[in-house]
Structures are given as C-alpha cells and as structure tokens.
UniProtKB/Swiss-Prot annotation:
Catalyzes the attachment of alanine to tRNA(Ala) in a two-step reaction: alanine is first activated by ATP to form Ala-AMP and then transferred to the acceptor end of tRNA(Ala). Also edits incorrectly charged Ser-tRNA(Ala) and Gly-tRNA(Ala) via its editing domain. CDD domains: AlaRS_core. It comes from Deinococcus radiodurans (strain ATCC 13939 / DSM 20539 / JCM 16871 / CCUG 27074 / LMG 4051 / NBRC 15346 / NCIMB 9279 / VKM B-1422 / R1). Pfam families: DHHA1, tRNA-synt_2c, tRNA_SAD. It catalyses: tRNA(Ala) + L-alanine + ATP = L-alanyl-tRNA(Ala) + AMP + diphosphate. Keywords: Aminoacyl-tRNA synthetase, ATP-binding, Cytoplasm, Ligase, Metal-binding, Nucleotide-binding, Protein biosynthesis, RNA-binding, tRNA-binding, Zinc. This is Alanine--tRNA ligase. The lineage of its organism: Bacteria, Thermotogati, Deinococcota, Deinococci, Deinococcales. Its EC number is 6.1.1.7. HAMAP family: Ala_tRNA_synth_B.
Length: 890
C-alpha cells in the first residue's frame, strides 16, 4: 500500500507545481505583519497588497507577475475554539499562488483542479469535488461546468456574504482590493456525516464537506458607498489572482485522517503531551491535549520570528496563546515547566520549510520555559484568590459570574477549574454571568482584530469616560508624583487593589511614556505610603489617558492615593535607540535616495528595528556608509531639541512626516542641531515625533547595524544596536574573531588571509575528492552503465544500481549519466549514504513520480526523503534494503 504524502511533501509539491506554471517561489513572510494595520500576517496575500494595487512586481531584483508561497499565518479572533473543535487553528499554513495582472479566472480554476485531482499531484477523487461561486459570477460558473466538466449539481451560488473576499465587501467594506471568489470542497464521505451537498446550501455548516481551497479574483477597488448607499466598485488597474489552499486541510484529506490533530505534524506532539502528563489522549481531557499541541506550534513560530512575550501588541497576543496552553497543561496535571520540551517536535516537523525555527530553537525553548515558570506562579495566585472568595460563602450559594471571569481574565484561571474547586466548598458558579462577561470581552477583541491593532487595555472605554488627559512629565524627568484617578479591571472601576493583584492604573500625571510612534511603553515602579508595585507596561488612549499595567507587590493601592512613579533605567537605552532611529532614517535617505519611506519601527531598550521602502538588499558598502553617517552625528555630539509647532510650519521647515500617518494641528518636532556631510551634501535630521530622546547625539554611543532583511514586497527591515548593546555586540564579535584566529594559529588581523588560504586548499581537496568519487562511480557503473540491473516495473523501464563510497553530487551525477546511457525511463542509484531517483520527461508525462518512489524506497532503506516528479533524493543507511523494495514499490 502506498504511504500517504507527508505534510512536507504536499507543501513541496504545491510550490513545485506552480513553479512549472511559471511562478516565482518566494519564502514565507514573517508572522509579524508587513504593515502596521494588523499585528500578525493573517493571509497569504498580505505581503503583496501593494502589488495588487499596481506596485511593480519585483522581488529582490527578480521581476515576476506570478508568485507562489507557503505562508505561515496567525489568526486569534476565535482562539477559544482552538482545541474544542478539531478544525480551528491559531497558526496555519496557507499555500498560495498569485497573479499581478497576468493570468485570471480560467487559469486559476484549471490549475487548482489539475493540482487537486491530477494523479501525479494530490490525486483526489474528481467525483467528490464540489465548489461554490458568487451568485453573479457566470464566468467562473462557466469554467467549472464547461471547461472542467463539473456537474451543475456540485456547484452552489452564494451571495457576497459567502463568496466575496473580504466577506460582504461591496456593502460593508473595508475599502481596497476585493472581488468574487470560488471555494473548493471535498466530500469526506458518510463517516463524517449523513448530510448532503444540498443540505450545506441551507446550513453553511458541515463536517463532511471540507473546504480546501479558496480562489479569489481581486478585480475591484472598493470605495465608500455612494449617496444612495449603493456599493462603489472601481476596476483595479489590472485583474489579479489571490488563492489560499489550507495545507492542514489538504493533509487531512490526503492522509485520510479524521482531523488536523491526527496528521503527521500534530500527532507526535499530541502523543508527547500524553506522555508528559500521564493522561491518555481520550475523553474530555483530549481538548487540553489539542490546545497544548496547537498553541505550542503557534508560539514556537511566533517567537522564532522575533516576537517576545510581553503585555503589549504582538507580545501580548503571544502571551495569551502561551498562557492558554499552560492553563490546559495545568488541567492535565503539569505543575512544573514541561511544554518547552515540545518545541523540539515543532522544529523537527517544520524546521526544514522554515529554517528560522532551527536557528532560534534554543531561544524559543528558553522563552517558553520562562513564561511557564512565571505563569505557573500566577496560577497559584489565582488559586489563593479563589480560596479567599469561597471561604466566606455558605454552602449552596453561587459565585457570581463576574468574579469567575476576573479569575480567568486576571489570573488566567479556567472556569472549569473554578467550578471544580467551588464544588469542594459546596458552591456553584454563575456560568451564565461568566459567559456574559466573556462574550463582552470577546466582542471588544473581535472589534480590535477586525480593524487593526486593538489596545492592550481594551474594554475600559466606558470606565474611562470623564477622566481627564494625563499630564506627561517624562520628557524631562524619569520620576514624578501623581494621584490615582482610577483602578480598572475587566472594564470595571475598582476601589482598591490588594497585594498580588494586577490591574490598569490611571494617574493624574506620569513620567511613564505610553507606547506610540514605534517606541515601547515605559516600565518601572510605583511607590506610595505603605505600598509599592511594578509598572509592567504603559499605553496611551487616543484621548491622551495613560494606562499603567501595575502589579501590586505590597500594601494596598486605592483610588485617590498619592504615588511616586520611577521609570526603569531601561529608559536611557530606549532614548538612545530612538534618537539613533531618526539618524538611521536620515542616513538611509542620504545613501539610498529620497524614495526611502519609513514603513514601521520598534524602539526598545535592547534594539531598534526599522522598516523602510527599498527594492533590494543593501550592499556591504551601503551599510558601512549608513553606519559612518550615524557615527559622525554621534562624534559631533550635537544637541537634540524639540518643540511644538503648527503642522504647516513643521512641514515648511522640512520636518519628515510618516507617509499615511494622521497628525493633529499642532505637532512635536524633534531636531538634531547639526548636519553631517555625505558626498558634499549636508544631511540633517528633523522629524515629527512624540517619543523620548537623548539630549545630545554623543549620548547614543556606539552604533551598529546587525541585520538587513526583506520582510515584504519592496520593504526592507534593519535591526540595529546603540550604546551598551552595540558595544556588547561588537565585543562579542571581537572575542569570536580572536578565538577563531587562535584556532587557526594567526592573529585577528591575519584571519581573512588565513581563512582565504584554507578555503583554497579545501576547494582543491574537494575537487580532487569529487574527481576520485566520479572515477570510482564510473568504475562501479561499468561501460555504458552495464553494471546496472534493468527491468520493467509498473509499465516503466527501470535501471537500478548500488554504489559504494558515493554520496551527494557524485551520486546525482551518476544518476544523470545512467539515465543518459541506459535508455531507461527511471534510474535508481543507492549507496549506504544516499539514494537518488531520476525520471525522464516522457516518464513523468505518463505518471512516473520520482518523489513518490524515493519515499517508499527510503523507508525500506532506513531513511526518508522526497522531491519533484523528475528528481528526488533521500538519506538512507541501507542501500540493499532500499533497492530490495523496488519490486513492491510500483
């Protein structure tokens, strides 16, 4: 029996298939969104939004109107369903093929059908395929029925709520690219339900009919409704294609498993969860197994991409996902950090496609473990809080739902665990009240998710009514006094906060900077008579109210209390990085040209990150020029000043404003009081900015760019360090250079020459070794490949040969030579270090698939592998075993 394709093989086949259709294969974009309107990348097309609007389709210097990707996506709008159903995921892989003004509906439909049903690709049963189309899209309906031959009864026509992307965009928006879509479904059979395709038309729900692919035809630019309330859809400059095939969905069909958690990626993780917890994957606890498995995969990818657990933005969402996993691990009996041990399994299954997982495995494991250690302590605090509530209640009474939700929202306490402990006291839980509070919080989260980044402290809108804007005194000082105006939790005003509790605190004035303009919010301490607390984060509302996330360490904090705020010493490092960001921006415009526009930034104590528009990677010379310009500003020790002025005056003075950013009538302008020279031209820095900065450029200290990478079409990302962080990084490089020089018996100054000489020697040795291996292979092959065994298998002429001491390129070269000399349709060459299968074009056209064959043979040879229809390879340890499986592999 043929082994089902692995998820990795399905991914590779998809990308290779579209490469054969003239598509440029691009790597996945980071889970960090390429634009500031969303926290995470939520769709395969997101990195290409500008291309859909007409921007040149050039990627790292390669022009291509056809692109294919495997995109890692994060969606958390319905995270509470993850694990409770077997289809919801917070992280999923979206396979996509895209056209920017090239092919359109006909090709998109034909190629999707070919890939799904073609025997050399996915081989799905054509009779089990069903589709939906937009009710007015006769063009797509015609292609499905007339070109493909799909019976009309296998097609449903739906309105814009179902078959338009974004859903119901004509009436509800958002503005921008949109168009009708056609969804492809697969009938999994009566084992998954006795409903029919006709039933699906009425219910829109089915476990039996699984959507596997959505073909979107973005051809319109949605505008505001006209005066009569009718949709306005203008034609885009050209018609586009945006498709999304759910990799996990297709894998469940191809592998014939009942759900995502039974596929080859999730199953090992679920089994490991059962092993760590001692709880089998069955019954009610299976929900927790699935939550832990899914969330650890999601968090591993998010953290590997550079998001750190925090109380703001992406870090806050990552923390929510991680803490939900920890809660469910706790319900399985895991009282000590264990989930970090699962990261290795995620890397094993996905690291080949996403090498950032491999490169950052240690950091991910350390981050997950630290979060486990911290939150398990918080869970214990929740237990104490619940015990305090229950101890004063009579048997037969009911714990109010708001208190149950506070335990969940503040301490991450599962309501199931709350109910279980309450029963020991003879107390029930108001589940309806809990559900009401939870739904209220979810509505706020969904609203923020739909339109962009939600505020960390969402849910306080009503509670904030009537509060004045906070007076910020932190530009000139890092400590200051203020009065507590409000204590907020779960959208409600509190009268006091006891020790061990965490909530949002509003002060009359504050030295803590509220996150904005790319600069992270300040942390530090609050102190008052008889108490103290940790300020974990600071945010700011649009109305200018500063929100401090405070954990009370000792004493009790009450509304009206006078407090003293002390900003963390990290502020100095943040200021260095923020001013350095301004200088970096000015230097980039000088070196790369005025077309450079800021696309986003993050300024923190440990580093700065700067996203900007530029079509190609920077050269080493350009990076050096930028670093030199910044260093000139630092050496000159110019004053850094700021003042508020009308926006028209600021723009007239040449202040740089962020493209697309909305400003008020009066703006704050930060200026470096001195220019530096670049090629005979004076370069200056003056920007609209509300952030905190150093007082003189000399305070920045050392500056170094540590990376330059592509994050989206036409968008680059620089990461850089300033001050102590830069010095430490440079010292580490110098130490590494000294150690390397010592190992090579030279000085650091002579390291380049020494390495160059060794490389030359190595290349010469490799060349000699390769030549010797080729000669050895030719000797073993015999004249004209006479040593090979040739026979008919599965309608193909197959030549096979075992070689000794041959691997890598020489093994592939031997396969090429044997294919030329033997006249065979397929050749199979094996050694105890590798296996190669190659097929002629004619053989591939007749259904041969080297990748499928190599998978079967590798399994018998103690290894695994895969590849394209015409060429595939594997690592094995038993050549005889692999070749011995040939007769049964066809």
């Amino acid at each position: 029996m043929t082994a089902p394709l692995t998820t990795a093989e399905i991914r590779e086949r998809y990308l290779y298939f579209f490469e054969t259709k003239g598509h440029l294969r691009l790597p996945s974009h980071s889970t960090i969104a390429p634009d500031p309107t969303t926290l995470f990348t939520v769709a395969g097309m997101q990195p290409f939004k500008e291309n859909f609007m007409g921007a040149p389709a050039v990627f790292d210097g390669q022009p291509s109107k056809r692109v294919t990707t495997a995109q890692k996506c994060v969606r958390v709008g319905d995270i509470e369903n993850v694990g409770r159903t077997r289809r919801h995921l917070s992280l999923f892989e979206m396979m996509g093929n895209f056209s920017f003004g090239d092919y359109f509906k006909r090709d998109a439909i034909h190629w999707a059908w070919e890939f799904l049903t073609g025997p050399e690709w996915m081989g799905m049963d054509k009779d089990k395929m069903y589709v939906t189309v937009y009710k007015d899209d006769d063009e797509a309906f015609g292609y499905w029925t007339q070109d493909i031959g799909l019976p009309a009864e296998h097609i449903h026509r739906f309105d814009a709520d179902e078959n338009f992307w974004p859903a119901n965009a004509p009436l509800e928006g958002p503005n921008g690219p949109c168009g009708p879509c056609s969804e492809i479904y697969y009938d999994r059979g009566e084992n998954y339900g006795d409903d029919t395709w006709g039933d699906y038309y009425q219910t829109r729900e089915s476990a039996r009919f699984l959507e596997v692919w959505n073909l979107v035809f973005p051809q319109y630019d949605r505008q505001d409704l006209d005066a009569s309330g009718q949709p306005v859809l203008k034609d885009l400059p050209f018609k586009n294609i945006d498709t999304g095939m759910g990799l996990e969905r297709v894998a469940s069909v191809v592998q014939d498993v009942p759900d995502f958690y039974s596929n080859d990626v999730f199953k090992p993780i679920v089994e490991r969860v059962a092993e760590l917890s001692g709880k089998p994957y069955e019954g009610e606890t299976s929900v927790s197994h699935r939550v832990v498995a899914e969330h650890i995969r999601s968090v591993s990818m998010i953290v590997a991409d550079g998001t750190a657990f925090s109380n703001t933005g992406r870090g806050y969402t990552a923390r929510k996902i991680m803490r939900r996993a920890i809660r469910h691990g706790y319900m399985l009996g895991l009282r000590e950090p264990q989930l970090y041990r699962l990261v290795e399994l995620v890397v094993d299954s996905m690291g080949g496609a996403y090498p950032e997982l491999q490169h950052n495995q240690s950091r991910v494991e350390a981050s997950v473990r630290a979060e486990e250690e911290q939150f398990l302590k918080t869970l214990e605090g929740g237990i104490k809080r619940l015990g305090g509530l229950l101890s004063g209640m009579e048997k037969g009474s009911t714990l109010v739902g708001k208190d149950a939700f506070e335990l969940y929202d503040t301490y991450g306490f599962p309501v199931d665990l709350t109910k279980e402990i309450a029963e020991e006291y003879g107390v029930s839980v108001d589940e309806a009240g809990y559900a009401e509070s939870l739904e209220h919080a979810q509505e706020i989260a969904r609203a923020g998710s739909k339109y962009g980044k939600s505020e960390l402290f969402g849910g306080h809108q009503e509670a904030l009514d009537g509060l004045p804007a906070t007076q910020f005194v932190g530009y000139d000082q890092t400590s200051g006094d203020g009065q507590v105006l409000a204590l907020l939790s779960g959208g409600e005003r509190l009268s006091h906060l006891p020790a061990g509790s965490e909530a949002t605190v509003v002060l009359s004035q504050t030295p803590f900077y509220g996150e904005g303009g790319g600069e992270v919010g300040d942390t530090g301490r609050l102190e008052w008579d008889g108490g103290a607390g940790i300020v974990r984060d600071t945010q700011k509302t649009k109305q200018g109210v500063f929100l401090h996330d405070v954990l009370v360490e000792q004493g009790e904090l009450k509304e009206g209390t006078r407090v003293r705020g002390v900003v963390s010493p990290e502020r100095a490092a943040i200021q260095r990085h923020h001013t350095a960001t301004h200088l970096l921006h000015a230097a980039l415009r000088a070196v790369l040209g005025g077309g450079v526009q800021q696309k986003g930034s993050r300024v923190a104590a440990d580093q700065l990150r700067f996203d900007f528009s530029h079509g190609a990677a920077m050269s080493a010379e350009e990076i050096a020029q930028v670093e030199t310009l910044v260093s000139r500003w630092v050496s000159a020790n110019f004053p850094v000043s700021w003042r508020e002025m009308p926006i028209a005056e600021a723009k007239a003075a040449g202040a740089t404003a962020l493209f697309g950013e909305k400003y008020g009538d009066v703006v704050r302008v930060v200026r470096v009081e001195g220019d530096v020279d670049f090629g005979g031209h004076a370069v200056s820095s003056m920007e609209l900015c509300g952030g905190a900065h150093v007082s003189r450029t000399g305070d920045i200290g050392a500056f170094v760019i540590v990376s330059d990478e592509n994050v989206a079409a036409g968008v680059r990302r620089i990461e850089a360090l300033a001050g102590e962080q830069a010095t430490a990084w440079l010292r580490g490089r110098l130490n590494a250079s000294a150690k390397a020089a010592a190992l090579l018996n030279t000085s650091p100054e002579g390291l380049e020459e020494r390495v160059s000489g060794l490389q030359g020697q190595l290349k010469a040795a490799e060349k000699e070794t390769a030549q010797a291996r080729r000669q050895l292979a030719e000797a073993q092959m015999g004249g004209g490949g006479s040593a090979a065994q040739t026979r008919e298998l599965g309608g193909f002429k197959v030549a096979s040969l075992k070689l000794s001491g041959i691997e890598g390129n020489e093994l592939r070269g031997a396969a090429d030579k044997l294919l030329d000399q033997s006249g065979a349709d397929l050749v199979v060459i094996a050694s105890d270090k590798g296996l190669v299968v190659k097929a002629t074009k004619d053989a591939v056209a007749k259904g041969a698939h080297a990748g499928q064959l190599v998978s079967k043979l590798a399994a018998a040879g103690g290894g695994k592998g895969g590849g394209r229809p015409d060429m595939a390879q594997a690592g094995i340890t038993d050549a005889a075993g692999a070749l011995g499986a040939l007769d049964t592999a066809f």
